[in-house]
Amino acid sequence: MSKILKSVTLGDVKNGGIFRALGKEFVKLDADEHGCLVLAKEIWTRMPFREGDDPECPNDLRRSEIMPYLGNCLAEFTKNGTPLSTFIPLRIDLQDTTGQNEYGIFEVRIGLLTLRGYGKYWRLIPKVDAPWWLATPYGTPNCSPRTDNDYYVWSVNTD
């Protein structure tokens, strides 16, 4: 899960460096004048994208069960004394794998990497022993990408 944290102390951490904050370990992916893009070093939980079906918007991250979970993480961090301003807004472009923009852009303080973000930072991302979600929706309900076993990077099957 990706997060943006605003902190002057992260200026000393190089991109790809691991640091501890909020009781968890993170990897610094990038920084600019607004703050740092960081990724949790470990998977925090395993969960489905959605319980049940959503025929209207099957790929919409905003309607997934992941976003309430991430919102609860943010609430827990702030309840434990971390100022909300520590988490600067992250704009997630939900352009799908075919370039369609039907889901638009939305802003969160804790979110997921997109497929493009993964492509940009993959060398810095620690290896984990389980699959994890990206924010990018697949382009059509008639073709569903998946990764499987240890020999697929991306498999697209048609109906």
What are the residue ranges of the model-derived segments?
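Collagenous Gly-X-Y triple-helix signature in extracellular proteins
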Residues: S2-D159
